[in-house]
């Protein structure tokens, strides 16, 4: 309990989300998401420990835009933790605006990270339907479990992989709005939130965060 009280005291100093961040999430979650209640706060203790996972198959949009793997495993740190409507960010992942320049410009890495964390906030705000709690969200970070590993060709339960699905949708919607998997992701999200159809969302003129050697052909087919 003392730890939770300390977290709440810390988050009282956090920033609210920007107008462009609100626009980005409004296109995905609409009125089902209350942006006014969200607070972002850098927390030095987030990501202090490293974890090692097997390299993920290069089958998702998220993995295809990243630098190619250099070995059979990779090391990573927790980038953020959500406590109710407060997002505690690893200093290496802290930005003053994760959607700077949006909708004309988007940094996919930043936008996808932000969307992932906002989905956990959304899950809490809609907990009557999702059954979500911050303690359930912490299960993402337990040892030996890669929170981003899923097969995009399998039927996926939103309640189990919701944050990763929204993240993947942002990636596919931006790079391949008319692709088959983009439509499947849209259908999955539309069953639980008022997401805007990918072909109705303006495409940014400038897209950052994509590795220079990434093959975008058929990236979300």
Predicted regions and their residues:
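Sec-dependent signal peptide recognition
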Residues: 1-7
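Post-signal peptide N-terminal segment of mature Sec-exported envelope proteins
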Residues: 18-50
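Active-site scaffold of zinc-dependent metalloenzymes
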Residues: 56-111, 124
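Short active-site segment of divalent metal-dependent hydrolases/proteases
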Residues: 118-119, 123
